Amino acid sequence: ALGYAAGQTSQGNNAVAIGRSAGSQSQSTLSVAIGMQAGQLTQGQTAVAVGYRAGEDTQGENATAVGFGAGLTTQALGATALGYKAGQTSQGQQATAVGYLAGTNTQGLGSTAIGFSSGQVTQGTNAVALGREAGHTSQGNNSVAIGYQAAEDNQGGSSVAIGIRAGETSQG
C-alpha cells in the first residue's frame, strides 16, 4: 500500500493499493487498486480498479474498472468497465461497458455496451448495444442495437435494430 489511507483496513494477501484512499477498506486477496479512491470500499478477490474513483464502492470478484469513475458503484462479479464513467452505477454480472459513458446507469446481467453513450441508461439482461448512442435509454432484455443511435430510446425485449437510427424510438 502506498499513499494516504491506502489499504488502511482489512487488506488481503498480495493486494496492491496505490493512491490516496485506494483499497482503503476491505480489499480482498490479489486485488489491485491504483488511483485516488480506486477500489476504496469492498473490493473483491482479483478485482482490478485503475483510475480516479474506479471501482470505488463494492467491486465484485474478478471485476475490472479502468478509467475515471468506471465501475464506481456496485460492479458485480466478472463485470468489465473501460472508459470515462463506463459501467458507473449498478453493473450486472459479466456485463461489459467500453467507451465514454457506456453502460453508465444500470447494466443487466451479461449485457454489452460498446461505444460513446451506448446502453447508457437501463440496459436489460443479455442486451447488446454497439455504436455511438446505440441502445442509449431503456434497452430491453435480449435486445440488439447496432449502429449510430440504433434503438436509441426505449427498445423492447428481444428486438433487433441494425443500421443508422434503426428503430430509433420506441421499438417494440
Across the structure, where does each feature detected by a protein language model lie?
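Glycine- and small/polar-enriched repetitive beta-structure motifs of secreted/surface proteins
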Residues: 1-172
